[in-house]
From Swiss-Prot:
Described function: Catalyzes the attachment of glutamate to tRNA(Glu) in a two-step reaction: glutamate is first activated by ATP to form Glu-AMP and then transferred to the acceptor end of tRNA(Glu).
Sites where the protein binds ATP: 243
Protein name stated in the entry: Glutamate--tRNA ligase
GO CC terms, sorted: cytosol
EC numbers, comma separated: 6.1.1.17
Family that this chain belongs to: Belongs to the class-I aminoacyl-tRNA synthetase family. Glutamate--tRNA ligase type 1 subfamily.
Name of the gene this protein is made from: gltX
Motif 'KMSKS' region, chain ranges: 240-244
Chief site of localization: cytoplasm
Description of how the protein assembles with itself and partners: Monomer.
PANTHER family: GLUTAMATE--TRNA LIGASE, GLUTAMATE--TRNA LIGASE, MITOCHONDRIAL-RELATED
Native source species: Aliivibrio fischeri (strain MJ11)
Keywords from the UniProt entry: Aminoacyl-tRNA synthetase, ATP-binding, Cytoplasm, Ligase, Nucleotide-binding, Protein biosynthesis
PROSITE patterns: AA_TRNA_LIGASE_I (PS00178)
Length: 474
C-alpha cells in the first residue's frame, strides 16, 4: 500500500509556522516512505475564506520547497460528493435529521450546566424529541451523525501512543448545517477516504476530533488512517506562539531575509531530533525523519537559533542557491545587477558576514551602485589629511595596473606601505572607506577587484576631493 499524507490548511489567513511544520513533517514522512503528498485547501467556511489566503499558502509551500504530488484540491468544489455521502448515511440510518433550534439547544445546555451535568446534545431529551415530532417536511434542520452509544474509540497515535475515548463522551455530531454546508469533521473524513490518505499528521488541537472522525470512517466502511498529533509551538517565554514573539508567517520570514533551507532545518528540529545533529540537508531530513522521534512535549521557538542557522546556510550553501533567494531582496532595494560583478562572486566574498539576506543585499549595494557621500563616522575617522598621500600613491598605482587581480591589488597596498613606511591601517582603512563608502567590508583588495577599476579610480578621486574640501574648511 502506498503511503499517502496530506496538508490541509484553511484559507482564512497566512501559512504560519505551526502549519508549516505540520506540512513539513507530512511531506518528509511521505518522501521517507516513498509515498505521496497531497495538498488540500479546506475552504468550506465561505464567509472567512479568501483567495488572498489561498495564494499566500501556495506561495509559502513553493518557497519552502514542499511540492505536492496531488492537488491542490478544494473542498468548496466537492459539495456534491459530501451530499452524496450524507444521503448514504441517512439511507443506512447512520445519520438523521434534527429540527431542534439553536435557541432550544442553548436552553437545554443551560439546564444541564445548572444541574452540574455535562453539557452535551442528547437525542433522547424530551424537548428534542418533541421538536422533531412537531417538525413538518421542509422545515429547517441539520443532519446529525448517529454516534455509537456503547464502547470506546481506541487508536494508536504515532507520536503519543494509545488513546482511548468512551463513546459516552461523544454526542451526535452535526455533519450538515441548516444552510446545507457540510461540517469540518465530516468532510475531512470523506476527503481522506476518497484521496486514499494513510497517515494524518496534524496538531494536537485535533486530538478531540479524532474519535469522532474514526466513528464516521467505520460507519462508512472506510479504512481508518493512522494518526499522529504534534505538540504545539511556544514562544521563548513559554506562552503560545503569537505575533508578539516576532514573525509567525512563513512569507514574513522570507521578507526578513531567511533562506528556506534555514527555516526548514529549524522547523524540523522544533520537535524532532536525530541525536545531537543540528544541521540537516534536505536529503538527510528525508532519509532520517521518523514520527517515533517526534517529541510529545511542546517546543519553544528561538529566533536567535534560527538566525544562527540562517547565517550558516548563507555561508555554506552554493552561491547560486543563495542568489536565487537574494534576488527578491535586491529587487526590493532597487539594486540592479546589470552594471557590476557576478552576484555569486559577491555572495562568496561578503556572505559570511551576513545573518540575513537583507544584510547581504545591503552589503552588495556598493558593488553595483555609486554613492554620493561617505558614512559620516567612517569619513571623519579615516578620510583626513594624513590619508591624502597614501591615497594619491594608491591611485597612481591602481591606474597603472594592467591586470586587475586581487593579488596585484594586494601588492599595490603593500607597495604603498613600503614606499611611505606606514602600517597597513594607514592605507587599508582610507581605501576601504573610499571604495565602499563605509568602514566595514571584507578584505579591501578583494573588494576592489570586484568593484572594478573604473569605479575604484573614481571613488578614490572622490575621497581625495572630500579630504581637500575638509582641509579647506578647517
Amino acid at each position: 500500500m502506498t503511503v499517502k499524507t496530506r496538508f490541509a490548511p484553511s484559507p482564512t489567513g497566512y501559512l504560519h509556522v505551526g502549519g508549516a511544520r505540520t506540512a513539513l513533517y507530512s511531506w518528509l514522512f511521505a518522501k521517507n516512505q516513498g509515498g505521496e503528498f497531497v495538498l488540500r485547501i479546506e475552504d468550506t467556511d465561505l464567509e472567512r475564506n479568501s483567495q488572498e489566503a489561498v495564494d499566500a499558502i501556495i506561495e509559502g509551500m513553493h518557497w519552502m520547497g514542499m511540492e505536492w504530488d496531488e492537488g491542490p484540491y478544494y473542498q468548496s468544489k466537492r459539495f456534491d460528493r459530501y451530499n452524496e455521502v450524507v444521503d448514504q448515511l441517512l439511507a443506512e440510518d447512520k445519520a438523521y435529521k434534527c429540527y431542534a433550534s439553536k435557541e432550544l439547544l442553548d436552553e437545554i445546555r443551560a439546564e444541564q450546566e445548572a444541574n452540574k451535568e455535562m453539557a452535551r446534545y442528547d437525542a433522547n431529551h424530551p424537548k428534542i424529541v418533541a421538536a422533531n415530532a412537531a417538525a413538518k417536511e421542509g422545515d429547517a434542520c441539520v443532519i446529525r451523525f448517529r454516534n455509537p452509544k456503547e464502547g470506546s474509540v481506541v487508536f494508536d497515535d504515532q507520536i503519543r501512543g494509545r488513546i482511548e475515548i468512551s463513546n459516552s463522551q461523544l454526542d451526535d455530531l452535526i455533519i450538515r448545517r441548516t444552510d446545507g454546508a457540510p461540517t469540518y469533521n465530516f468532510v475531512v473524513v470523506v476527503d481522506d477516504w476518497d484521496m486514499g490518505i494513510t497517515q494524518v499528521i496534524r496538531g494536537e488541537d485535533h486530538i478531540n476530533n479524532t474519535p469522532r472522525q474514526i466513528n464516521i470512517y467505520e460507519a462508512l466502511g472506510a479504512p481508518v488512517p493512522m494518526f499522529a498529533h504534534c505538540a504545539m509551538i511556544l514562544g521563548d517565554d513559554g506562552a503560545k506562539l503569537s505575533k508578539r514573539h516576532g514573525a509567525v508567517s512563513v512569507m514574513q520570514y522570507r521578507d526578513e531575509g531567511y533562506l528556506p533551507n534555514a527555516l526548514n532545518n529549524y522547523l524540523v528540529r522544533l520537535g524532532w531530533s536525530h541525536g545531537d545533529q543540528e544541521i540537516f540537508s534536505q536529503e538527510e531530513m528525508i532519509n532520517l525523519f521518523s514520527l517515533s522521534a517526534v517529541s510529545k512535549s511542546a517546543s519553544a521557538f528561538n529566533t536567535d537559533k534560527l538566525l544562527w542557522l540562517n547565517n550558516h546556510y548563507i555561508k555554506s550553501s552554493e552561491p547560486e542557491y543563495v542568489a536565487k533567494y537574494l534576488q527578491w531582496h535586491l529587487d526590493q532595494k532597487e539594486i540592479s545587477l546589470d552594471n557590476g560583478p557576478a552576484i555569486t562572486e559577491v555572495i562568496k566574498l561578503v556572505g559570511e558576514r551576513c545573518n540575513t539576506l537583507i544584510e547581504l543585499a545591503e552589503q552588495s549595494r556598493y558593488f553595483y551602485q555609486d554613492f554620493e557621500e561617505f558614512e559620516a563616522g567612517a569619513a571623519k575617522k579615516h578620510l583626513r589629511g594624513v590619508a591624502k598621500g597614501p591615497l594619491e600613491l594608491a591611485l597612481a598605482k591602481v591606474e597603472a595596473l594592467e591586470e586587475w587581480t586581487t593579488e596585484n591589488l594586494h601588492n599595490v597596498i603593500e607597495e604603498v606601505c613600503a614606499e611611505l613606511e606606514i602600517g597597513m591601517g594607514k592605507i587599508g582603512m582610507p581605501l576601504r572607506v573610499a571604495v565602499t563608502g563605509g568602514g566595514q567590508s571584507p578584505s579591501v583588495d578583494a573588494v576592489m577587484q570586484l568593484v572594478g577599476k573604473e569605479r575604484v579610480v573614481a571613488r578614490i578621486k572622490m575621497a581625495l576631493a572630500f579630504i581637500a574640501e575638509r582641509e579647506a574648511n578647517a
